[in-house]
Amino acid sequence: MWRVEFVACLRPSCQFCTAMCSILSAGRAWRMMNFRQRMGWIGVSLYLFVSAAAFYYVFEINETYNRLALEHVQLKPQEPHRGTTWTHSLKARLLSLPFWLWAALFLIPYFQVFLFLYSCTRADPKTVGYCIIPICLAIICNRHQSFVKASNQISRLQLIDT
């Protein structure tokens, strides 16, 4: 039964076989890369691995964390005492910020670093860093200014009718 399924899988249009062939030929592709690209792929791999480990650590469901979270939710909000330090009041204000703001504060830099590492895997070294927001905005503005400059120069040309 397994052998029949495997033989049927050897068709050229099979996605599994295509993926396996690409994995087997990855050694050849790895040798064709330059040092910067190899380091870029290693950086992307390590970045994703560390991100997965941190995600697992932060969002791991554990009885201790659940108990502490339930105790925190069940506590009645208390008015700040006169003896409360500025760090406690700052912590209380920061924790009251909405989730979307916290997500944006962490995800935008996270994706910027990931996209920069991914851009290091490109063959053309001139394209490294184009995905970083300030660089991208500078390139777009520069292109717009050069387009306006070129269109002004074209409009100044005199047409010669022959």
From Swiss-Prot:
Required for mannose-6-phosphate-dependent trafficking of lysosomal enzymes. LYSET bridges GlcNAc-1-phosphate transferase (GNPTAB), to the membrane-bound transcription factor site-1 protease (MBTPS1), thus allowing proteolytic activation of the GNPTAB. GNPTAB is involved in the regulation of M6P-dependent Golgi-to-lysosome trafficking of lysosomal enzymes. LYSET is thus an essential factor for maturation and delivery of lysosomal hydrolases. Pfam families: TMEM251. The gene is lyset. Belongs to the LYSET family. It is found in: Golgi apparatus membrane. InterPro entries: LYSET. The chain crosses the membrane at residues 39-59, 97-117. This is Lysosomal enzyme trafficking factor. It is a multi-pass membrane protein. Keywords: Golgi apparatus, Membrane, Transmembrane, Transmembrane helix.
